[in-house]
């Protein structure tokens, strides 16, 4: 992986390092008999129809126009596929955009397509940098379904009388609201308690100042149905891996017992 410093115009304080996957594929192993494990196959770029790996379906977008809202970015990138969430980094004091966003797609293929199409494109006079975000292994802290109980004001501008979907600051106009989540009968979920998405694989590159995520209390676009699908697929993958490990362990002890007899 290559470490590079990202400079954003008009943002002198942003001196955080970001990490990305190299665009050059790793050389094949020298031993031809070595067969890659199923987990390695599923984590390879463009890894077929395997399960979702967040580090392969999350885009890192920088040099965005500071006036673009969360909803604007969602509208732009949803043209390439189903977007599960958009997170815009904001200054912790002024609450203004820092020109950086993470866009989580349901499909890694859609994420790759969006990265190819949007990278180096000029938007509002600024040249975008778009790439697949890298893994720093901190999914549980940042990839969360956020639920805001205060529905009296807009989480984009802070004003009352409208929601962020219809915020006047949205340059691309109002956005259709996602369908309300289905209640599952559990009291805590009905009360709106935030539920973590349990990723056992990689997370987006979040080696940025953590306060921006911890204090980001305004704009967060969450497609609830997409989140449900992601959680279900991840749970199925985890169960598959658990069963494979169990089978391998049983086979190993079976061989040992034969030798002893």
Curated annotation (Swiss-Prot):
One of its GO terms (biological process) is developmental process. Disulfide bonds: none annotated. One of its GO terms (molecular function) is zinc ion binding. PROSITE patterns: RRM (PS50102), ZF_CCHC (PS50158). The keyword Nucleotide-binding does not apply. Disruption phenotype: Embryo lethal when homozygous, and defective for seed maturation when heterozygous. It comes from the Eukaryota. Residues 18-51, 165-261 are annotated as: Disordered. Residues 57-135 form the RRM domain. A zinc finger (CCHC-type) spans 153-169. It is found in: Nucleus. RNA chaperone required for proper U12 intron splicing and for normal growth and development of plants. Mainly responsible for meristem activity. Plays a role in regulating cell division. This is U11/U12 small nuclear ribonucleoprotein 31 kDa protein. The gene is SNRNP31.
């Amino acid at each position: 992986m290559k470490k590079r410093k990202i400079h954003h115009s008009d943002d002198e304080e942003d001196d955080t390092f970001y990490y990305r996957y190299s665009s050059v594929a790793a050389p094949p192993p020298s031993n031809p008999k070595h067969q890659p494990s199923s987990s390695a196959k599923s984590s390879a770029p463009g890894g077929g129809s395997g399960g979702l790996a967040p580090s392969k379906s999350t885009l890192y977008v920088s040099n965005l126009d500071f006036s673009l809202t969360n909803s604007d970015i969602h509208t732009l990138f949803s043209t390439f596929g189903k977007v599960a969430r958009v997170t815009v980094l904001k200054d912790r004091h002024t609450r203004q955009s820092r020109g950086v966003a993470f866009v989580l797609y349901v499909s890694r293929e859609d994420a790759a397509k969006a990265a190819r199409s949007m990278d180096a494109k000029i938007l509002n006079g600024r040249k975008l940098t778009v790439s697949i975000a890298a893994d720093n292994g901190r999914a549980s802290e940042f990839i969360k379904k956020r639920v805001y109980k205060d529905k009296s004001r807009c989480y984009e501008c802070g004003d009352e009388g409208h929601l962020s979907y219809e915020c006047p600051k949205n340059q691309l106009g109002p956005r259709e609201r996602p369908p309300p989540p289905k209640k599952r009968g559990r009291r805590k979920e009905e009360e709106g308690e935030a539920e973590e998405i349990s990723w056992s694989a990689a997370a987006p590159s979040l080696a940025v100042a953590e306060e921006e995520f911890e204090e980001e209390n305004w704009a967060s676009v969450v497609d609830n149905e997409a989140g449900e699908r992601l959680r279900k697929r991840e749970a199925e993958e985890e169960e598959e891996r658990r069963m494979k490990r169990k089978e391998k362990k049983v086979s190993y002890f079976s061989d040992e017992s034969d030798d002893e007899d």
